[in-house]
A protein has these predicted regions:
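Nucleic-acid enzyme cleavage-core boundary/entry regions
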Residues: 1-61, 71-174
Length: 174
């Protein structure tokens, strides 16, 4: 059967935390959807190297970013874009990370921790002008967060699958 390193050139699911990454590895998500899995920034090293080699050869790769709903999650796309900027538009980056409204709709608890309060001003351009985006900005400033792994594993896989699968050959968790 195919291994996790076999599906790394066309599209890659990039996880920001090990717990989420392992859920996708142990459940064989990469086999169901033919997608590479990467724990940011470079684990497994073979996958990270193949992505850079593929992009350097002039081929396109879509990187799907999966992250928690927290300050680091909201900054994750910018971090990945900076790391792949040398490849220009060949690295297509799609942010699939959880947002506060999604967490609420999925029944994921939104927690608050005063130790996570961030008095620095969050870049308003990153959040835009919509009510939902301004609400997220305020929640992040007050230390709110929601973790992906609070979803049951199969539900997390299906939620992610539904946001990536685009063709009939993408059979799996749908």
């Amino acid at each position: 059967p195919p291994d996790v390193a076999d599906y790394t050139t066309r599209r890659v699911l990039v996880c920001d935390r090990q717990e989420v990454f392992l859920s996708f590895i142990f459940n064989g998500f990469f086999r169901k959807l033919e997608i590479g899995l990467l724990l940011w920034p470079d684990y497994p090293k073979l996958v990270a190297n193949q992505i850079h080699d593929h992009l350097a050869a002039g081929s396109k790769t879509t990187l799907y970013l999966l992250h928690d709903c927290n300050r680091a999650g909201y900054d994750f796309k910018e971090t990945v874009q900076e790391a792949f900027q040398e490849h220009g538009k060949k690295a297509h980056i799609v942010d699939l990370g959880m947002r506060f409204r999604q967490a609420s709709n999925l029944g994921v608890p939104i927690r608050s921790d005063t130790a996570r309060e961030d008095s620095s001003d969050l870049d308003p351009l990153q959040f835009g002008d919509s009510g939902e985006q301004q609400e997220a900005r305020l929640m992040l400033r007050s230390g709110c967060f929601a973790h992906l792994e609070e979803l049951p594993p199969l539900r997390m896989l299906r939620w992610t699958y539904s946001r990536i699968a685009t063709r009939t050959q993408d059979v799996g968790y749908g």
